[in-house]
């Protein structure tokens, strides 16, 4: 039974699941990471493809320090559990150059830099004598020359065991079975053992068992020899279990003796019998699966757990140090070692002053001056630090300059948005609807009403005119629209309105007026069809008498020889005041013009 192969896209999806953004503090999904390392170790995906998938994930998360940290944690788990073929790909130039760039990058977090440098140091200590992995030594020496601190790493005894993960052996090709030496034919086919990689016939390779130490948890084909080896390991693990049970019974007896000694001591001291005596609970031995009885697997698990505990202790100590300090930053601040001390500054100033003095002296004096030579050696040692400080200052200046340009762009955008909003507000106020109480037209609104066209009756109501209304009324009274009305009707209306105004003794109290928006069509129709209102400036001293209306049956038109005195001096044709009778029996009304006084317009 062959193992199912895995595609690169599926492997990328598993990597994203292990390094999910929702996992805080740069942690990983440990169960998914171990499953991923088992897939690499069982060669369901070629080691080179697995290495390139991890490198691609590192380059994708370059701008996110949290995800970058989780990806490198996953790389560490795969390195220590993926086997030697994957380690060879990790220690190649293609992957180690990426690791070196992450360590030397200025934007790398301090904690991430320390973690990656620790990975390089562990690889160096484990494989510095291996000729196939010699590129790790070159990267280590290059980082040390660049000033990366590698002195904290100490060689441990179990360092080689951390990278010693058992992997399936390479398949061997042969023409005969490696147990019975039977030649393979068309009917007797050959089969490979997934544990040792040998070639066997169907008779000697018919067993199927899982291989958890190789990262294979599904039953696969093994030969008879490998099956017997796994069977012996299971039996030996059962014997260890029985010994563990005996030791457990001895520990229970010791607890019982301790309990009795406590009871006797309490009785001797005169304590009451009701005193609480702690009862030791009997622990049941845990049942372990036979797959977990492999000593190599146990050693690998213990090493990984021990490393995980050390990592947790280190993180807790860093968290305590972070909370004890007054700085609110999450990561510890990077110490700037480029600052010059006071002694170095004094040496530089002293060297400069001595050089100025030596300009006037002969060259032999310069060579004989030992103090100048010593200062020269000191200044040469300070020169790299000055260069680093200068480059650091330039990089900070560029960063601040970019931030300042971004802020200025944002402020310009914000100002343009504010100007646009203010412009919209001014336009909305400019084109707003005028007040409903204000009359946009200059016509006099107090128009008389008629009940019937044949018998006109004027209902005059008391009004209080303001100066503005009087001025507007005067101007409207002289408009060309009002001149289309007949002279007799104008005189009659004016006389009746003045008579009603004289009859009222006093003006009533003003009533609230409801303002409505005027209609242009209705006002024009009222001005043409209806009679105009009374003039606002009558003569108080002159009393106008009502003229006598004479019925003239001969002519329906008013006298043409009489000239009316109006505000303007234009003469317009007159219109019949009433409908002409057919038989000529009706009498016509003869009206006499009344002399009106010219109105004064206030300027």
From Swiss-Prot:
Compositional bias annotation for Basic and acidic residues: 281-294, 547-561
Query: Biological process GO terms, please?
Result: protein targeting to vacuole; protein transport to vacuole involved in ubiquitin-dependent protein catabolic process via the multivesicular body sorting pathway
Q: What residues does Zn(2+) 2 bind to?
A: 193, 196, 223, 226
Q: Which residues bind Zn(2+) 1?
A: 177, 180, 201, 204
Residues annotated as region Disordered? 273-294, 320-339, 496-561
- Fetch the Pfam families from UniProt: FYVE, UIM, VHS, Vps27_GAT-like
Task: List the FYVE-type zinc finger ranges.
Answer: 171-231
Regarding the membrane, this protein is recorded as:
Peripheral membrane protein
Pinpoint the VHS domain residues: 20-151
Where would I find the UIM domain in this sequence? 253-272, 292-311
* Gene Ontology molecular function terms on file: phosphatidylinositol-3-phosphate binding; ubiquitin binding; zinc ion binding
Question: What is any one of the record's Gene Ontology cellular component terms?
Answer: endosome membrane
Purpose: Component of the ESCRT-0 complex which is the sorting receptor for ubiquitinated cargo proteins at the multivesicular body (MVB) and recruits ESCRT-I to the MVB outer membrane.
Subunit structure, as described in the record: Component of the ESCRT-0 complex composed of HSE1 and VPS27.
Annotated protein name in UniProt: Vacuolar protein sorting-associated protein 27
Q: Which organism is it from?
A: Kluyveromyces lactis (strain ATCC 8585 / CBS 2359 / DSM 70799 / NBRC 1267 / NRRL Y-1140 / WM37)
Q: Could you tell me the gene encoding this protein?
A: VPS27
């Amino acid at each position: 039974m062959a193992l199912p192969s895995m595609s690169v896209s599926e492997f990328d999806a598993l990597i994203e699941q292990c390094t999910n953004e929702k996992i805080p503090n740069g942690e990983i999904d440990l169960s998914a990471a171990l499953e991923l390392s088992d897939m690499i170790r069982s060669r369901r995906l070629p080691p080179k493809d697995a290495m390139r998938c991890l490198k691609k994930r590192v380059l994708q998360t370059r701008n996110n320090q949290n995800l970058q940290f989780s990806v490198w944690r996953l790389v560490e788990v795969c390195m220590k559990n993926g086997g030697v073929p994957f380690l060879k790909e990790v220690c190649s130039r293609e992957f180690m150059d990426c690791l070196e760039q992450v360590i030397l990058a200025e934007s790398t977090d301090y904690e991430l830099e320390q973690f990656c440098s620790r990975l390089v140091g562990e690889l160096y200590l484990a494989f510095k004598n291996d000729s196939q992995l010699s590129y790790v030594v070159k990267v280590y020496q290059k980082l040390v020359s660049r000033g990366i601190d590698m002195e904290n790493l100490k060689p441990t005894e179990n360092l080689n065991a951390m990278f010693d993960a058992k992997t399936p052996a390479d398949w061997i090709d042969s023409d005969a079975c490696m147990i019975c030496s039977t030649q393979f034919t068309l009917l007797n086919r050959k089969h490979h053992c997934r544990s040792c990689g040998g070639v066997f016939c169907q008779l000697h390779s018919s067993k199927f068992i899982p291989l958890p130490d190789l990262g294979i948890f599904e039953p696969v084909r093994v030969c008879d020899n490998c099956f017997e080896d796994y069977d012996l390991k299971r039996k030996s693990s059962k014997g260890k279990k029985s010994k563990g049970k005996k030791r457990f019974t001895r520990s229970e007896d010791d607890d019982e003796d301790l309990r009795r000694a406590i009871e006797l001591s309490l009785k001797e001291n005169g304590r009451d019998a009701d005193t609480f005596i702690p009862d030791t609970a009997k622990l049941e031995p845990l049942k372990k699966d036979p797959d977990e009885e492999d000593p190599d697997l146990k050693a690998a698990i213990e090493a990984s757990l021990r490393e995980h505990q050390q990592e947790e202790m280190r993180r807790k100590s860093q968290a305590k140090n972070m909370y004890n300090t007054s700085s609110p930053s999450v990561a510890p601040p990077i110490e700037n070692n480029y600052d010059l001390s006071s002694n170095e500054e004094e040496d530089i100033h002293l060297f400069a002053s001595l050089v100025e003095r030596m300009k006037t002296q002969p060259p032999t004096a310069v060579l004989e001056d030992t103090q100048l030579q010593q200062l020269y050696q000191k200044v040469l040692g300070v020169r790299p630090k000055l260069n680093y400080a200068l480059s650091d200052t330039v990089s900070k200046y560029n960063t601040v300059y970019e931030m300042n340009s971004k802020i200025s762009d944002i402020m310009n955008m914000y100002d343009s948005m504010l100007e646009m909003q203010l412009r919209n507000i001014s336009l909305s106020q400019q084109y707003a609807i005028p007040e409903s109480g204000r009359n946009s037209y200059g016509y006099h609104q107090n128009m008389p009403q008629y009940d019937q066209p044949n018998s006109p009756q004027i209902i005059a109501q008391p009004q209080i005119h303001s100066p503005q209304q009087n001025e507007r009324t005067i101007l409207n009274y002289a408009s060309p629209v009002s001149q289309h009305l007949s002279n007799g009707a104008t005189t009659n209306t004016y006389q009746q309105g003045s008579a009603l105004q004289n009859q009222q003794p006093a003006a009533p109290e003003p009533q609230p007026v409801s303002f409505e928006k005027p209609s242009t069509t209705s006002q024009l129709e009222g001005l043409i069809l209806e009679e105009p209102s009374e003039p606002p400036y009558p003569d108080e001293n002159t009393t106008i008498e009502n003229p006598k209306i004479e019925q003239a049956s001969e002519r329906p038109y008013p006298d043409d020889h009489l000239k009316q005195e109006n505000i303007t001096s234009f003469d317009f044709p007159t219109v019949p005041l009433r409908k002409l009778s057919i038989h000529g029996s009706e009498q016509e009304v003869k009206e006499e013009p009344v002399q009106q006084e010219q109105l004064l317009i206030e300027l």
